[in-house]
Curated annotation (Swiss-Prot):
Key word Coiled coil present: no
GO cellular component term, pick one: cytosol
An example Gene Ontology molecular-function term: NADP binding
Signal peptide coordinates: none
Keywords: Amino-acid biosynthesis, Cytoplasm, Diaminopimelate biosynthesis, Lysine biosynthesis, NAD, NADP, Oxidoreductase
Keyword NADP: yes
Domain of life: Bacteria
Protein residues bound to (S)-2,3,4,5-tetrahydrodipicolinate: 135, 144-145
Native species: Legionella pneumophila (strain Paris)
Protein's UniProt name: 4-hydroxy-tetrahydrodipicolinate reductase
Similarity comment: family membership: Belongs to the DapB family.
Enzyme Commission code(s) on record: 1.17.1.8
Length: 243
């Protein structure tokens, strides 16, 4: 029997590809393709969906996640915009409901490897900044991938970065800061998704860069998440935990 999946945000570019990918996969049945005017909770009940893949917007992803969990389906969240307090609340809710779920800041396997390599490098290089770039239709900044990368680096590095006594002549010139790591966000036509993690040391720099040039690169990660989530009893933050 195929696993019943709802794709929420099915009319977007990612949603269309996700529907096509899951419909052509022998393990899954797409039982509903939802957009903003649809009732997510009622659709879960009507279709008896086991998984909801959420590919919507930053301004509604938290409420969507609550709805999915409270209606007994397993969330596979590919929408950025969740902050740490919200992730913690969703984690607690999954524990109470004993429902597995996945929040994936990035579904690209190459991007996950970039984050893992950056985490390893941070054991040796404490000076690091992140430069992320996306298309101009992405309305939140910094990206979920950049935030997750900063969190992974901060947890792994062995000493704090240097405190520089500089004055910003233009406010924000040094970018934003997350876990004491500067993040610079670009929003330009011609970009899909790009991230560079730039490390510095005396006499050298190390750059780890990943470019997504086609949304199809995210599809293997969506399939992997849907395959793994039914076996989870807790909420997992980051696809790297499933590799």
């Amino acid at each position: 029997m195929r696993t019943r999946v709802i794709v929420n945000g099915a009319n977007g570019k990612m949603g269309i590809l996700a529907c096509e990918t899951l419909e052509n996969h022998e393990q899954f049945e797409v039982v509903a393709k939802l957009s903003r005017q649809d009732n997510l909770g009622q659709s879960i009940l009507d279709t008896k969906a086991q998984i909801v893949v959420d590919l919507t917007r930053a301004d509604c992803v938290y409420e969507n996640s609550l709805t999915i969990i409270n209606h007994g389906a397993r969330p596979v969240i590919g929408t950025s915009g969740l902050v740490e307090t919200q992730i913690n609340e969703l984690t607690k809710l999954c524990e109470i409901k004993q429902i597995g779920g996945i929040i994936a800041p990035n579904f690209s396997l190459g991007a996950i490897l970039m984050m893992m390599l950056a985490t390893k490098a941070s054991e040796y290089f404490s000076e690091v900044e992140i430069i992320e770039g996306h298309h101009q239709q992405k309305l939140d900044a910094p990206s979920g991938t950049a935030l997750k990368t900063a969190e992974m680096i901060a947890a792994a590095r062995k000493k704090p970065k240097n405190k520089l006594p500089l004055k910003e002549l233009t406010p924000g010139a040094r970018g934003g800061s997350h876990h004491d790591i500067n993040i610079h966000s670009l929003r330009l036509p011609g970009l899909l998704a790009r991230q560079e993690v730039l490390f510095g040391n005396i006499g050298e720099t190390l750059s780890i860069t990943h470019n997504s040039i086609d949304r199809r690169c995210f599809m293997p990660g969506i399939v992997l998440a849907c395959q793994k989530v039914l076996n989870l009893t807790n909420l997992v933050y980051g696809l790297e935990h499933l590799l």
